[in-house]
């Protein structure tokens, strides 16, 4: 029966029973889970034997809101984030932000406009220059708000971040 097959799969592949891997295989989203299963996924990912299989510089973080494609608001995205700093911290943190404002972009979508100090502007320019064509995750309080692809170097210390913000 179908339920017996599901129970067998849960025994043999417990993580796969609660986390659906991203079928595209590209981008920073590695999987999807129903919100009721995210704690279970976190438990599996925290297991020593699972952690040992993952790269040391990999951080797995949930999106802050349900996936855009899910109108019921139940499915959350799990992002794979490469930690580029030796200390495991983000290459840029809030200490370089001099101003951040809630605004609306040219498409009338909520966004955050931010300005950085000189050090932050320099580091942001290097970070964006070195990651053209790749995604840079915007993580606040441990959740991914946005993971846009970088189109080019961003200089001048001013950026606008769009993503899962609510007005």
Region locations from a protein language model:
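Non-transmembrane, solvent-exposed regions of membrane trafficking/translocation machinery
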Residues: 1-150, 154-155, 159
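Short, intrinsically disordered, charge-balanced linker/junction segments flanking boundaries
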Residues: 164-167
